[in-house]
Structures are given as structure tokens and as C-alpha cells.
């Protein structure tokens, strides 16, 4: 995070109970949130951004757990693992699409929005982003996820796995479901989790309450 943005946000939270609420402090919050969401996007856009982080890794859908166990025992461990990897790769490819949407939400954040975030819960900023961006993120992520899943072979792997399972368990056929929607939803869950972690850093910075920082902000 840029030092200037960090300093402004530190003071912003330090002035939570003050009657004064300078516009420059609100601007500092917006800048810091822009950097924070950017960090979240950058982290998840990397190779293994999702797959290598247990907190956001996209696992098999619950309804596929039994299917996976049967297939693993039948010698299809690699196919199951490849399928999980391909879902996460699709999420990683879609993640960069979130950056301009978050940036737009920050630009549109009003003075009143900033006040609510300051005085709200520990997840107020993350909740703001969820409210303002979830629908648009879903619309943007899903086609990218779909294309990525096809390129990574996830859709093909899913069909192959279900076909194998159905041929092995004729009386336990697995129902089909919207795989793209599932991966998109999990990708966004992970994105907002990372945004929440960035918000926590902003709120709990141990240097946030020093007089020196106040002097830096106000040029005294």
C-alpha cells in the first residue's frame, strides 16, 4: 500500500469519534481501499492464487464428493485432481476482471458511504463492495470462467468423470448442474474473502494512532 494512502487511512480510523471528518481523510480511505482491492485481485490472479491457498481454493461441489470417492477408488485419482485444478485455474484467469469494477465502486463512493464505512462494522468496506459489485462481477466473471473452463478442460473433465461414474454405478446416476455458476460463485467468495483481509489490515495497523502521522497528514 502506498505510504500516503496508508497514513491517511490510519488517521481516518483514528478520527472515528471526532466531530471533524475532513474530505482529505475520506479521500485517503478511498485511495487505500483502491489499493487494498487491487492487492486482493493481484493475489488471486497469480498462478495458484486460488489453488495454492486453502482459504479460497475451489473444491469439488458437495454433490460430487461421493462421485469423487468412487472414482478415486477405481483408479481415477489424477482425473479428479486435474478437474479440481482446472476449476481453480479458471478462477485465476477471471480474477483480473474484478479490478476495474472495484476501482469504479471506489470512485463512486460518496462522502456518506465513507462515513458509514468508518463508523460501521469491521467488515463495512467489504460489505459495501459486495453490495455494489456482486451482480456486475457475476456477469463479468461467468463468461470468462466458462471460456477458461473449456480451455483448461474442466468442462470436458467434468463430463468424463460423470460419464465414468454413471457407467460404474448405473443406479446412482449423478444429476447435472451449472458448473460455470458454481465456479463463478466460489471465485467471488474467495475474492471477497481477500478484500476482507485487506480491510482488516487497514483497520488494525498498529501505527495508526501516532501523533507523528497526524502531523504528516496535516503538514504540521
Task: Mark where each language-model region is.
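Bacterial N-terminal signal peptides that target proteins for export
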Residues: 1-8
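Bacterial N-terminal signal peptides
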Residues: 8-16
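N-terminal Sec/ER secretory leader and immediately downstream segment
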Residues: 22-86, 91
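Pore-lining and gate-forming transmembrane alpha-helices of multi-pass membrane transport proteins
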Residues: 30, 131, 174-177, 181, ...
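Residue-level signature of catalytic and energy-coupling elements of molecular machines
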Residues: 40, 110, 206
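Mid-length scaffold segments of soluble, non-membrane domains
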Residues: 79-151
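An amphipathic alpha-helical core segment
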Residues: 144-186
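A cross-kingdom marker for long, charged
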Residues: 188-220
Amino acid at each position: 500500500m502506498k505510504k500516503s494512502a496508508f497514513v491517511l487511512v490510519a488517521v481516518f480510523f483514528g478520527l472515528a469519534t471526532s466531530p471533524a471528518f475532513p474530505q482529505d481523510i475520506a479521500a485517503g480511505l478511498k485511495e487505500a481501499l483502491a489499493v487494498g482491492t487491487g492487492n486482493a485481485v493481484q493475489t488471486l490472479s497469480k498462478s495458484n492464487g486460488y489453488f495454492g491457498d486453502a482459504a479460497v481454493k475451489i473444491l469439488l461441489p458437495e454433490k460430487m464428493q461421493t462421485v469423487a470417492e468412487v472414482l478415486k477408488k477405481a483408479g481415477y485419482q489424477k482425473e479428479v485432481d486435474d478437474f479440481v485444478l482446472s476449476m481453480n485455474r479458471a478462477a485465476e484467469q477471471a480474477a483480473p476482471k474484478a479490478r476495474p469494477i472495484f476501482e469504479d465502486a471506489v470512485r463512486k463512493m460518496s462522502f456518506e458511504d465513507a462515513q458509514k464505512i468508518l463508523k460501521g462494522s469491521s467488515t463495512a468496506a467489504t460489505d459495501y463492495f459486495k453490495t455494489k459489485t456482486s451482480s456486475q462481477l457475476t456477469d463479468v466473471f461467468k463468461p470468462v470462467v466458462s471460456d477458461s473452463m473449456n480451455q483448461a478442460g474442466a468442462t470436458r473433465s467434468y463430463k468424463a468423470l460423470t460419464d465414468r461414474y454413471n457407467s460404474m454405478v448405473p443406479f446412482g446416476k449423478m444429476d447435472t448442474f451449472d458448473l460455470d455458476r458454481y465456479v463463478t460463485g466460489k471465485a467471488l467468495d474467495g475474492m471477497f474473502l481477500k478484500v476482507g483481509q485487506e480491510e482488516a489490515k487497514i483497520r488494525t495497523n498498529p501505527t495508526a494512532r501516532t501523533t507523528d502521522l497526524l502531523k504528516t497528514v496535516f503538514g504540521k
